[in-house]
């Protein structure tokens, strides 16, 4: 089974690692791809403190560190995984990649009510995905 695990820097996503590990150990053959979609960097005014290139490099560095954290958690459990870092619209990128997988795994939306109502991409992914979606918490 090929599983796309959409990761982010939220507690709910870190909690989803436990579910992913249990799932991996319950299946004979499983391949995980860890996907982090970083937002495109836009700078509207020149502050003189940091330029676009520096900001973009910082965001990429943070994203790579996040992927490494998740990779390490999987390796600790002897689960093979591949990491992919993309930038762009989260929904578009995830749905495009999901076409090549059997299952999409995402962490539950953050607990904060305002976040769930206005920022969460969870509902869009569930409604628009062509493959089954598991929301782990």
Swiss-Prot record:
Domain of life: Bacteria
Stretch forming the signal peptide: none
Pfam family, one: Usp
Family under the similarity heading: Belongs to the universal stress protein A family.
Protein name from the UniProt record: Universal stress protein HP_0031
Source species taxonomy: Bacteria, Pseudomonadati, Campylobacterota, Epsilonproteobacteria, Campylobacterales
């Amino acid at each position: 089974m090929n599983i796309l695990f959409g990761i982010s820097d939220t507690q709910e996503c870190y909690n989803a690692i436990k579910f992913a590990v249990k799932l991996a150990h319950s299946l004979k053959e499983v391949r995980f791809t860890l996907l982090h979609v970083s937002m495109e960097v836009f700078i509207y005014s020149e502050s003189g403190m940091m330029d676009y290139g520096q900001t973009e490099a910082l965001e990429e560095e943070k994203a790579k560190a996040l992927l490494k954290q998740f990779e390490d958690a999987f390796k600790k459990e002897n689960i093979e995984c591949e990491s992919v870092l993309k930038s762009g619209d989260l929904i578009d990128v995830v749905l495009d990649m999901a076409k090549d997988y059997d299952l999409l795994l995402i962490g539950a939306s953050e607990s904060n009510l305002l976040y769930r109502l206005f920022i969460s991409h969870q509902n869009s992914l569930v409604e628009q995905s062509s493959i089954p979606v598991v929301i782990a918490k």
